[in-house]
């Protein structure tokens, strides 16, 4: 991702065809180590492509990825209601009391 970001920064800055050294300068300026193989791969993949089209294609791919929100909604239904509601009320009453600040040996404004 860092190489894609550096590539985008270079193109947004007016360099339509950034080289490895251009991207290395950008990444070095913020202290990121460069892996030459990864850098070369990103440049070769993005060479000659319109960044707006690449971003639009990426958005389409991300939209098709399940976000996990459906899993959380399905989890309560799969739990099976084996417990009696009266038992749940009794369990809530047995919660421990909150600890006071006196037990800690210091106060908030001391």
UniProtKB/Swiss-Prot annotation:
- Would you kindly state one Gene Ontology biological process term found in this protein's UniProt entry? cytoplasmic translational elongation
One Pfam entry for this protein is Ribosomal_60s
Q: Where is the composition biased (Basic and acidic residues)?
A: 86-95
Molecular functions per Gene Ontology: structural constituent of ribosome
Q: How is it modified after translation?
A: Phosphorylated.
Q: State the species of origin.
A: Cryptochiton stelleri
At the highest ranks, the source species' classification is: Eukaryota, Metazoa, Spiralia, Lophotrochozoa, Mollusca
Under the subunit heading, UniProt states: P1 and P2 exist as dimers at the large ribosomal subunit.
For this record, the Gene Ontology CC terms, alphabetical, are: cytosolic large ribosomal subunit
Alphabetized UniProt keyword annotations: Phosphoprotein, Ribonucleoprotein, Ribosomal protein
Matches recorded under CDD domains: Ribosomal_P2
Q: Which Gene3D superfamilies match?
A: 1.10.10.1410
Protein name per the record: Large ribosomal subunit protein P2
Q: What does this protein do?
A: Plays an important role in the elongation step of protein synthesis.
Q: Where is this region: Disordered?
A: 63-110
**Stated family:** Belongs to the eukaryotic ribosomal protein P1/P2 family.
């Amino acid at each position: 991702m860092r190489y894609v970001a550096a590539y985008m920064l270079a193109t947004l800055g007016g360099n339509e065809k950034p080289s490895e050294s251009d991207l290395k300068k950008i990444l070095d300026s913020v202290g990121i180590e460069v892996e030459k193989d990864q850098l070369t791969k990103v440049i070769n993949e993005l060479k000659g492509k319109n960044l707006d089209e690449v971003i639009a294609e990426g958005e389409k791919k991300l939209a098709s990825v399940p976000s996990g929100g459906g899993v959380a909604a399905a989890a309560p239904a799969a739990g099976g209601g084996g417990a009696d509601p009266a038992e749940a009320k009794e369990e809530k009453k047995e919660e421990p009391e909150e600890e006071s600040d006196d037990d800690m040996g210091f106060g908030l404004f001391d």
